[in-house]
UniProtKB/Swiss-Prot annotation:
Organism of derivation: Xanthomonas euvesicatoria pv. vesicatoria (strain 85-10) (Xanthomonas campestris pv. vesicatoria)
Protein name per Swiss-Prot or TrEMBL: Probable alpha-L-glutamate ligase
Binding site for Mg(2+) 2: 260, 262
HAMAP family for the chain: RimK
Chain sites annotated for binding Mn(2+) 1: 248, 260
Enzymatic class: ligase
CC cofactor: Mg(2+); Mn(2+)
EC code: 6.3.2.-
Length: 295
């Protein structure tokens, strides 16, 4: 196969591992910086160009799209989709995952449990809005934040109101969620490829923080996801239209709750902690999917 990887940096761990895995299995792999791609759209057809030359002949494209370039990079990916290139994570699915409110609405529509989430705009409704969550602590999240950025824990009702009012003053879109205390700052990252969880790790927040992201000082250890947790993770990815995803769950008294579905999950943490060749699993999934679509 001829595989394209949409990535701004070929030296990033995840990008390097996907290149290695693809070439090891005999495929031609090329890195495309999405911001260097440009396109022609007309009724007589679609074309994509890169550094002065047309891009043609790719069987599959793996999107590694950072949050800061979401809009442009998904437009490039969509162009490749219209040109008949297979992708495990379509452009519309990535856009769903990057909008926390929309993602939670789609998950809830499939009966997938999550922390209770509220969203509202008018300041006159703030008190009633927050009352739907019960007493604090509350978790306020920017709607398009990533990697733990823009996530605030408020421990008093006055703090919740203050943060909500401040974000409205900045015209920021945000959601507010109930805080699940029994999770004790830990979550479960399930790495979904196709219709199964290929690796899982338990992440623990650093002392004094409640966010378990590894780059914020959290720690991780390999763990075994239960059958229920694996089912929830796969259903969550499917609900957004993704076949490669990092699904973050917390273990609660009412079962696994979905925090987020990441459409561009990093490989370094999960491969290093779990000792699983996730990159190879992704490439094998591409092979199977392209064969099915061709047949």
């Amino acid at each position: 196969m001829k595989i394209a990887i949409l990535s701004r940096n070929s030296k990033l761990y995840s990008t390097r591992r996907l290149i290695e895995a693809g070439r090891k299995r005999g495929h031609t792999v090329r890195i495309l910086d999405p911001l260097r791609c440009y396109m022609r759209i007309a009724a007589d057809g679609f074309s994509l160009h890169y550094k002065g030359k047309p891009i043609t002949g790719f069987d599959a494209v793996i999107p590694r799209i950072g949050a800061s370039v979401t809009r442009y990079a998904t437009a490039v990916l969509r162009q490749l989709e219209f040109m008949g290139t297979y992708t495990p994570n379509p452009s519309d699915a990535i856009l769903r995952s990057r909008d926390k409110l929309r993602a939670h609405q789609l998950l809830a529509a499939q009966g997938i449990d999550m922390p209770v989430t509220v969203f509202g705009d008018n300041p006159d409704d703030t008190q009633d809005l927050l009352s739907m969550l019960g007493p604090p602590p509350h978790v306020v999240k920017l709607n398009e934040g990533a990697q733990g950025a823009g996530v605030i824990l408020t421990e008093k009702a006055s703090a919740s109101r203050g943060v909500v009012e401040a974000l409205r003053g900045l015209y920021a879109n945000f959601i507010v969620q109930e805080f699940i205390g029994e999770a004790e700052g830990a979550d479960l990252r399930c790495f979904v490829v196709g219709d199964k969880v290929v690796a899982a790790m338990r992440r623990q927040a650093a002392e004094g923080d409640f966010r378990s992201n590894l780059h914020l000082g959290g720690t991780a250890a390999v763990t075994e996801a239960t059958e229920q947790e694996q089912e929830v993770a796969v259903r969550s990815a499917r609900a957004l239209g993704l076949t490669v995803a990092g699904v973050d769950l917390i273990r609660s008294k009412r079962g696994p709750l979905v925090l987020e579905v990441n459409s561009t999950p990093g490989l370094e943490g999960v491969e290093g902690v779990c000792g699983v060749d996730v990159a190879a699993a992704i490439v094998q999934h591409l092979e199977q999917s392209v064969r099915r679509s061709a047949g």
